[in-house]
């Protein structure tokens, strides 16, 4: 057993450990912690063990305790350690009471940060996290480094710990839900931007901003910070930086960071030297927002990997699933899956990547974020708007109240289901048109997450005759 794994074993052996929820990462850890000698309690809103489906058999086999139903948080009392799932609000009173009573409240990601023996690169922001995180991991891989990729991007990190060597690198996508309670920061920290998001979950915008700042606050020099220059909030984070802070910017030149030069070259300026490293025309990724993601990723790894690795990946990488992902061309109409568009800013970035007006399918779960900024972009870039979900009426109101709506010729329709939305969009399309699913909303009214939503859209589109 490696030193780090041994330290984790010493932390949990003989301890009373509560897990909030049985998501994918917690299922793996529950089994591991039982094996390490912990007394595990699973706290969950489900009413009975049978409600866990196929996992019920594992629960019975492991012999773990259960605290279920309406009062599942009663199981927090008397625990030595509580593992919080990111979706569980950190400032809920039962959890804060447990902290006051001396319980260690942590999470899978926090434990990984505590015991990881290798360098960690962390990426957060309201938009661009996953593409930037993926690019960074591919830059390191192209340079021959072994990469452990995880966090909010999908894979649990702590189970990887036995395979992590000091010379490796961990590349971690971090959400505000994960960051809000973290007390360690990565060696290299990237903040892409901060715009209103998840305000259904956070108390207010300031709590959301403070959660994002946590990626910087616990860094120990030597360290590196990469901040988006175009965003007022990320620019305000400079006083939080403890190491070598650099910018990335598409719209300005800088003598300290990565930027898009007027001649179409992506450049890095550092220590008085400007190095052009990639031509915009050679980039396969669609959209100007992806130029920003490339700049952010390059600024993060600059000096850590050869320029040739950045050039190779930058000129061949075609994107991540659900991000302006081409699905199919049918009857001369191209369908795109941009289900990652869970906020207005994401959808705006997607719309701006098209050079003609599109047919947009939008709407979903309401995160209580404003839609007024979306309205002028819809009027400028959309010819037919198909709305669904709880935010459909809010998006329609914002668009219809915009002074340019009356003269725009924009048509608005409403759909009850994704199938219905695709049918309406198809009926409105002419050869040469593009139909894009970019909801500007979360998925939770109809789907567990944006991935499931995007895959249903693709399935429906691919089954069209």
Language-model regions, residue ranges each:
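N-terminal leader/targeting and accessory segments in enzymes
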Residues: 1-107, 111
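Nucleotide phosphate-binding/pyrophosphate-handling subdomain across enzymes
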Residues: 8-16, 26-36, 146, 277-384
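Residue-level signal for inorganic ion chemistry
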Residues: 33, 82, 123, 152, ...
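Phosphate-binding loop of NTP-binding sites
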Residues: 35, 73-77, 86-229, 233-242, ...
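Short internal beta-strands
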Residues: 39-47, 225-229, 361-362, 381-390
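Short beta-strand "acidic-cap" motif of Rossmann-like dinucleotide-binding folds
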Residues: 40-44, 149, 171, 247, ...
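Beta-strand->loop->alpha-helix junctions that form or flank phosphate-binding loops
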Residues: 41, 69-70, 106-110, 242-261, ...
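C-terminal helical cap/extension that packs against the catalytic core
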Residues: 56-57, 374-432
């Amino acid at each position: 057993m490696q030193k780090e794994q041994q330290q984790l074993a010493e932390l949990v052996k003989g301890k009373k450990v509560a897990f909030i929820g049985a998501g994918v990462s917690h299922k793996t850890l529950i089994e591991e912690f039982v094996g390490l000698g912990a007394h595990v309690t699973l706290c969950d809103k489900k009413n009975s063990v049978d409600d866990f489906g196929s996992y019920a058999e594992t629960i019975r086999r492991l012999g773990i305790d259960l605290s279920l139903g309406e009062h599942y948080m009663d199981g927090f009392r008397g625990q030595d350690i509580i593992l919080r799932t990111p979706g569980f609000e950190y400032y809920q009173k039962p959890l804060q009471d447990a902290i006051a009573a001396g319980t260690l409240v942590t999470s899978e990601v926090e434990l990984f940060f505590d015991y990881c023996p290798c360098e960690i690169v962390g990426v957060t922001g309201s938009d661009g996290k996953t593409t930037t995180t993926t690019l960074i991991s591919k830059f390191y891989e192209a340079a021959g480094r072994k990469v452990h990729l995880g966090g909010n991007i999908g894979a649990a990190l702590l189970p990887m710990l036995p395979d992590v060597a000091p010379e490796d690198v961990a590349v971690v996508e971090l959400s505000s839900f994960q960051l809000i309670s973290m007390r360690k920061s990565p060696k290299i920290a990237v903040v892409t931007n901060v715009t209103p998001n998840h305000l259904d979950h956070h108390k207010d915008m300031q709590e959301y901003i403070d959660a994002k700042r946590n990626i910087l606050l616990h860094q120990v020099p030597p360290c590196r910070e990469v901040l988006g220059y175009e965003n007022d909030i990320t620019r305000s984070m400079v006083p939080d930086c403890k190491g070598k802070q650099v910018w990335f910017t598409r719209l300005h030149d800088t003598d300290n960071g990565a930027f898009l030069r007027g001649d179409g070259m992506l450049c890095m300026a550092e220590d008085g030297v400007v190095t052009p490293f990639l031509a915009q025309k050679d980039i396969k990724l669609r959209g100007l927002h992806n130029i920003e993601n490339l700049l952010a990723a390059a600024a993060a790894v600059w000096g850590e990997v050869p320029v040739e690795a950045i050039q190779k990946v930058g000129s061949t990488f075609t994107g991540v699933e659900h991000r302006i992902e081409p699905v199919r061309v049918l009857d001369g109409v191209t369908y795109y899956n941009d289900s990652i568009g869970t906020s207005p800013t994401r959808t705006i970035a997607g719309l701006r990547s098209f050079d003609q007006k599109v047919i947009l399918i939008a709407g979903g779960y309401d995160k209580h974020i404003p839609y007024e900024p979306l309205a002028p972009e819809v009027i400028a870039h959309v010819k037919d708007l198909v709305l669904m979900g709880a935010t459909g009426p809010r998006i329609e109101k914002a668009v219809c109240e915009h002074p340019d709506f009356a003269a725009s010729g924009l048509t608005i329709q409403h759909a009850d289901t994704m199938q219905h939305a695709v049918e309406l969009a198809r009926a409105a399309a002419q050869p040469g048109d593009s139909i894009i699913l970019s909801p500007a909303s979360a998925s939770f009214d109809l789907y567990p997450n944006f991935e499931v939503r995007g895959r249903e859209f693709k399935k429906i589109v691919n089954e069209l005759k």
